[in-house]
Amino acid sequence: MRQLAHFKFFDTLSKKMVAGFIILILIGTVLLSLPWATPANVHTSLIDVLFTSASATCITGLTVVNTAAHWTTFGQLVILVLSEVGALGYMTFAVLLFNIMRRQIGLSTQLMVKASLNLERLSDTKSVMKYVVGLSLLFQLGGLGLLAIDFVPRFGWRHGLYVSLYHAVMSFCNAGFDVFGDSLQGFRNDPYVLTVTMILIIAGGLGFLVWRDVLLYHTRKRLTLNSKLTLLTTFSLFVIGFVLLLITERDLELLPTGMPWVNRTINTLFLSVTPRTAGLITMPTQGLQAGSLLVIMILMFVGGTPGSTAGGIKTTTFGVLMFQSIAQLRGRRDVEFSHRRFSQENINRALMLIFLASIVLTVATLILTQTEKIPKGFGLEYVLFEVLSAFGTVGLSLGLTPNLTLIGKIVIMMLMFIGRVGIFTSLYALSRRQARVNLIRYPAENILIG
């Protein structure tokens, strides 16, 4: 393994991170190809095994086969472990293993952890790692205990604890896999389970750095600009999404008649939370109104927070662009928030990220419209919904994924990978040369815009 670092492909952190996720996907593919991963006489094609492994590693949850019916307990546990490692980052577990073995962590390893968790300083690596592992255990074990209160009486001790563990991990990791067969549609009348699930989804999608900042607030008496922007954007999107879905799905015809208004409200709130890369659902997406699908697609595009278990363009990117637009409308030169000014580099990266994401999504949508069959009653949204779900590592589907062609599966896998690793990291990994400083700076000239 040490000799691999001398290969040209592994000469940058971006390439090492991309290679690490690819290796993890391949390991998952091998494990899911084993005979005891599926019931006897059940055949799974190589592309479907690879797709499942990629979906789990990229914590998406899009499936070409039913997780509950197609995979054995061993296969389901492989998916669970892949989702856990994919959510927290394989470097997190590598460092944890080094600590258990009492081995010194090298500089290159610390740099990869710093890059994978979006840390500002290398000195923060060890302290943040403790919070990542500690918070993950706290939320997932806490979720296991809370869900067991409902699931154990319902399913019995053995299966109840297994289901509680699986659902707690998948909810916190925002993976979207389930062992119920129909996601959470059987729990639409159970506000307790839905509330616990929403808490886990929000906790996982908020980001470890934000949680660390919040927990240290009692000593620092302040939050970083990143945490403030994240909390504001996250809360705003939840509220706006909830209100818009209340309007677009005001009749909630997909829910049983006579359902108490409290349960109907919680189902709508859950519908606004799950597009933030969770992928769990309490009602069939195919029956949602066109306006609801649009709201969900926007939420999937934004996604969660950098350094979290979520995908998408991230809440901070969305927040920076919103404040940049407000500053332009007010005629202000600087983009300000909470008595601080966003650097021009942040603004440029946000604009570039939106631009690149738009190109990737447009190309993917165009390809799928040519390779996939759109059923009657649907239009472009049938493909676009799946594309955004893959890019945002969400896992919601209008029914396209199980019927994808070979080319379609490859496209969706690439989108899931880019959504998890990040556009910038993916591009840097493909780049053959390092960025160079331009010694020549030409005169500026205005052009007509808009």
Task: Locate predicted features.
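Membrane-proximal intracellular helices of multi-pass ion channels
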Residues: 1-450
